[in-house]
């Protein structure tokens, strides 16, 4: 039995490295059912679960990672808390996202300025944006920009510029589109961690969709596709790719309704539990396609 577990762990880790999310997730799930995974394996398991569209399970696993990190590294625990807040926010749970942001803040109080403070500032900014709190959004955005400059951190600089661009577009300033173009095209800079880069893309695409800026939806969806190809080479299916495809299809007007239904139905499972906005768009696309097919 020990040999079987060892072999399954090897399969899970190897599959993850080659971006075979399904095999990795299923193998980790089998091992997790019979033995305790170490913290690094748990984190990878959570990531594979998210990419397979299992958002609720991914959050549950990452909460275990957070609990373990509390005992060993408060700064890493704070970073994990911020990631959890971002995940809950993507899934449409603003109150829980705020709760995790506050946990992260408590862990970072008194800690010398580090990148984790910047990611937390981003989380506070986007939760404020989703809550319609302009004052807190502005404060958190300025804080992020200051930390990015102080640390000379390229990833945080990209996040700060993305927030500035989305804020400008939302306020009706067309210069915001140019700022976002500079951040996102041809592709978002590689130093930005996957979870945070994905949030930038989903926010920019959702904003362009709300503004009926179909040219930007197409351009930024192409950028996200290139980003997926760079971060998930050889992977043909993942939640991130599905979110990208949902936005891409939302800007297509000449697709056969029946073909569109087939494509959207295949995407529904992957986005339903990881991105509330994309999940809503899936239902809109299905409703529109069914109506056109009649």
Q: Where are the language model's segments positioned?
A:
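Alpha-helical segment of the N-proximal tetratricopeptide repeat
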Residues: 6-27
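Compact, aliphatic and Gly/Pro-tolerant "microcore" segments centered on a short helix or tight beta-hairpin
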Residues: 99-189
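Single-residue signature of alpha-solenoid repeat helices
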Residues: 24, 58, 97, 137, ...
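Tandem amphipathic alpha-helical repeat scaffolds
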Residues: 11-17, 40-55, 78-94, 116-133, ...
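Amphipathic alpha-helical segments of tetratricopeptide repeats
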Residues: 25-33, 63-70, 102-112, 141-153, ...
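Acidic, glycine-rich loop-and-beta core segments that form the ion-binding/anion-interacting portion
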Residues: 216-271, 276-281
